[in-house]
Amino acid sequence: MQKKGKNNMQKPTLGNPQKTIEVLQKYGFSFQKKFGQNFLIDTHVLDKIIASANITKEDMVLEIGPGIGTMTQYLACAAGKVVAVEIDKALIPILEDTLSAYDNVTVINEDVLKVDINQLAQEYNQGKPIKVVANLPYYITTPIIMGLYESHVPIESITVMVQKEVADRMQTGPGSKDYGALSLAVQYYASPYIVANVPPNCFMPRPNVGSAVIRLTSHKEPPVQVEDEQLMFKIIRASFNQRRKTLANGLNNSPEIQLPKEVITEAIESLGKGASIRGEALTLEEFAKLSNIISKTL
């Protein structure tokens, strides 16, 4: 569904509790738990998101889950073009109302995981890199972010509100309890930076967890050289599926890595690591080296 509006660009009218309640009551909207809906009601947080995303009138921004259009209004004022993908059809009439003054916004009523984002980038931005800005549903954060990266959408940066714990996992390094497959995957594609921590009272309804704004600035080239990207991620997943096991046992027990145990052990030892090393101790560079060694034996 295309959203066309007037030519004037008014300042955002949403972003506080009173206005949010007014809009929700006007349309008799009920929050859907299955969609993980928590709307932002703090203008300071909204300003911080827009500033950290470094949006200009040259940019096309993809917003995932615009809700009632609060952040969409801020994005429309800053960007050249905004494409907002909203799964909840009950929000579409609200968005038509709250975004009626912004003629640079297109709203698509669809599940973002089923949308061809590459096609959107081509259609609305001539295939040039886009910026993604969103207050993401927490239950589906990882599939959305990894889906964007793994489908090789041209992305300059992703600036998103996520669960604090997930933000910590994205930016942490080896040896941390938060370090895992998500840390390595994100850091392979981008440089993560936590912009701000956001308390529950900045949302309606309040989530039960703390939140954080994180900016992922895409690498122009991967920071490591890897011969088989898919194999590296299979090794990474296998290494963290059973964290208490040694790296050798984790890889040996994985249905994705079907190699004799002695081959796996030799590959790990060729990194200069002992047999008792665990996956959580390896850096992205070491996982890339391990993958390259193993790929030669396949």
Cite the ranges covered by each PLM segment.
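C-terminal lobe and adjacent flexible extensions of AdoMet/dcAdoMet transferase-like proteins
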Residues: 218, 237-298
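Catalytic cores of RNA-modifying enzymes
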Residues: 1-238, 269, 280, 289, ...
